[in-house]
Amino acid sequence: ALDWVDVVSALSADPKATSELAQSISSYPKSSPGYFADTQKKVKDFVEAGQLGIFAKAYWGHPAYKLPPEANLMAVAHYLEALAWQRDVSRLHAIFGGKNPHPHFLVGGVPCPIDLDSDSAINSARLSTVQGIITQMREFVDQVYVPDTLAIASFYKDWGAQGEGVGNFLCYGDLPEKGIADPSSYLFPRGAILNRDLSTIHEVDLHAIDEIKEYVAHSWYDYSSGKESGLHPYEGETEFNYDGPTPPYEQLDVEKSYSWLKSPRWKGNVMEVGPLARVLMMYANGHEQTQELVNYTLQTLNVPVEALFSTLGRTAARTLETKIVADNLQTWQDNLVGNIKSGDTRTFNEVLWEPSSWPKKAQGAGFMEAPRGGLAHWIVIEDEKIANYQAVVPSTWNAGPRDAEGQAGPYEAALKGHQMVDPQQPVEILRTIHSFDPCIA
């Protein structure tokens, strides 16, 4: 958010005018002059004390910032509130997973038992807490996140023509209505879109050896079959071979190896994963709410459908996806309560819990649509021991280097043609890279 919002500019805003602006785009009840004056004072105290904290090391005053002071103050106030809101929402993870971050898990399900009469299980009080969080989440998304995104985006419509990337999108699929074995019931559909063509969704098989492959032609790894070859994760190898310059360094030779990431490809195609891929997949599948939200966004901003394939579109997709998920949370909560009332309190499937019940050799893939994109782990088990384990994470897809064919990954492709006002303050580059929500853990 702060790639588009000038925090220091908010100090010159008129809180009353900011309140009028906020009330013109939303019915959020906190949008009073006093609310924005308090935020302004808080930011002023940060600046005067030289303790900018989360606002430090930014490029405030950069000419690429286009928002008027009042819009900046509104966005900063809501940004600070979103931090607190995010903390409350993460309590859902703790309720169902024991803690956050890094919730507990159980092979075949979740670790939290359901017992309405127990103080240490999922009970009526915890279900009531969940309902309260869902209600709060939907209100914040509807009254703050969505209208703020549209308001801020209206000042940056030129970014609807920058940062496209590769134009290919991949989803593993997630959030099943009828169980993981039925991909047709996923809220996030599984599939691939090539060359921006939303009329055709290609089927994706995570287990097919000839579909997903990782390449290391420009990575600091070696394959026994040679650096030009590609391997499916079931056959994957992780052999380090760092031949780059001695750190620290300022420049890498991109004609050689230059990354610790591999280069995943689907049927040889560079693919983008993440919120934009999911929104496009839902849109192409005819998901009614997604189509309404996307069309409304395009009409409100008065930008063409091509603007979806951009830094602006990628950033907006995260907002629209949040709205879709927040609304569906209520349905999932109602289904959970309905199951409990009918006596269904199962939380995991123990059929394959005992290793002695496994075949002598087995392999499988666990997948999900993580916030930043498709995430999958592939495992090969022999004699009850792990023989091979490979993970292809979202930022590997998006941030991976060029492959043996010279195809740039989504990050590199999206940066093509970017112009910077000041190379020492590359806020333009940050906007596009941050639109992918990068994370290498």
Indicate where each model-derived feature is located.
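A translation/RNA-centric and nucleic-acid-associated enzymatic feature enriched
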Residues: 377, 382
